[in-house]
Amino acid sequence: MGRGSVTSLAPGFRFHPTDEELVRYYLKRKVCNKPFKFDAISVTDIYKSEPWDLPDKSKLKSRDLEWYFFSMLDKKYSNGSKTNRATEKGYWKTTGKDREIRNGSRVVGMKKTLVYHKGRAPRGERTNWVMHEYRLSDEDLKKAGVPQEAYVLCRIFQKSGTGPKNGEQYGAPYLEEEWEEDGMTYVPAQDAFSEGLALNDDVYVDIDDIDEKPENLVVYDAVPILPNYCHGESSNNVESGNYSDSGNYIQPGNNVVDSGGYFEQPIETFEEDRKPIIREGSIQPCSLFPEEQIGCGVQDENVVNLESSNNNVFVADTCYSDIPIDHNYLPDEPFMDPNNNLPLNDGLYLETNDLSCAQQDDFNFEDYLSFFDDEGLTFDDSLLMGPEDFLPNQEALDQKPAPKELEKEVAGGKEAVEEKESGEGSSSKQDTDFKDFDSAPKYPFLKKTSHMLGAIPTPSSFASQFQTKDAMRLHAAQSSGSVHVTAGMMRISNMTLAADSGMGWSYDKNGNLNVVLSFGVVQQDDAMTASGSKTGITATRAMLVFMCLWVLLLSVSFKIVTMVSAR
């Protein structure tokens, strides 16, 4: 197995592509006659060789138990569609159905599984050799007229036993003896590539060389920048330069090569036996296979190809810029500062201190604290209750009443009450009485009392307008009485009595004397009188009937006793 061959891979490196990679990259490039970056698949006629002879024909010399080959299909008939899969000692038999290989939602190829049988059909002996045959199925190539069935890609492996072996690993086990005295090993053409690379090609830049400016470069103070250039986040305010249009120029200190409006690029062409250069900081087009469309005349709708000239010069107005302009700032020089980047103090950036509430200009905090002053919470019942002299035309009781006048007033009040209880219960009569009290100047006490009783508001009759059955029943029960009492209160203030009178208990703590007057009016209810008279008549009649029944019963009993005693 040729350990010293140039195609040997180091331990751990294996050629194990996926189905999509086999179809979309390797088989498609082979059909389109395009070169490979690393040619690992050989071309052979699978159906002219036995499976155990194929490992020696592989380009990859390893002990792995799977091999890859390009093969041409052999038609059984020149004008037919059947394929001749017979070898000298056996044949490959199809097993199962063909499976689709998809790239997203698009079908890009088909996969067929075949098993090798010794002998001739239909009595062949089944073996453990299995082949996966991949064929291309691309609508774009079909429209372009590219023959897709010119080649098929075959993956051949040998199972460890009969039956399905899903998930079986076909990698060779590691043998330490094979690599004990192994020296430096290169992949194909890697040594030639390393010899052709000079030390002064500036492909690799040491970090110590950043402070040194190359002498062969022409440095400009200000170079125009393309409109679609992305400045990134490395810029500050426009205070670092005095340029008229700092957004379209690079600040001094950025080394740019004068190449006629283009950026000079290192040579990175990929020949058939060349290995790509991986350079940190460059931006490459995002594509799984960037070169798969070159050579077939087919443009994929999902892939954008970059066009380059023969002298390896790339136009700078592309979003795939290979020169990291924002990485070549020198330590002691100012950063690029375009004016289209937002400064930090433009008000659009929210700081933590901005979340606090700003104090208004016309707001005085001292007035707010003095609004709820405890001195203004002093309770004054006179302000809440209003003045005590709430009766109209009320005279002040500052004079000390004489005992004789007080006796006359009390006597006059008794006479008025007796006159009121004499049976005069109508409201018109009561109003006349109050008018009489007002017209009598010799009874000031009763005059004040009448004013007070007249100031008492009458109850509202709103509830009587919406009487329900329960309310009417309660009202009837309440109005069944014949006596209604009306009460009023009169307050006498600023009145002094003799110390030995013994009447100090009648004053409250404020020195006021409260007098409660009650007036009772007897009303005659005609309905109750009528019902009472009917009840008396009924009782009298029942009593008479009862007495007549007793008289009749006694007379009959007496008659019977007389007759019995006579016999």
Swiss-Prot record:
Record GO terms (molecular function): DNA binding; DNA-binding transcription factor activity
Pfam families (UniProt xref): NAM (PF02365)
UniProt DNA-binding region: 108-165
UniProt keyword annotations, A-Z: Activator, DNA-binding, Membrane, Nucleus, Stress response, Transcription, Transcription regulation, Transmembrane, Transmembrane helix
GO CC entries: cytoplasm; membrane; nucleus
Main localization (coarse): membrane
Function: Transcriptional activator activated by proteolytic cleavage through regulated intramembrane proteolysis (RIP). Transcripition activator associated with the induction of genes related to flavonoid biosynthesis and required for the accumulation of anthocyanins in response to high light stress. Plays a role in the regulation of 20S and 26S proteasomes in response to high light stress.
Species the sequence originates in: Arabidopsis thaliana (Mouse-ear cress)
UniProt note on tissues of expression: Expressed in root meristem. Expressed in roots, rosette leaves, cauline leaves, shoot apex, stems and flowers.
Domain notes for this protein: The NAC domain includes a DNA binding domain and a dimerization domain.
Membrane topology: Single-pass membrane protein
Protein name per UniProt: NAC domain-containing protein 78
UniProt feature, compositional bias: Basic and acidic residues: 397-423
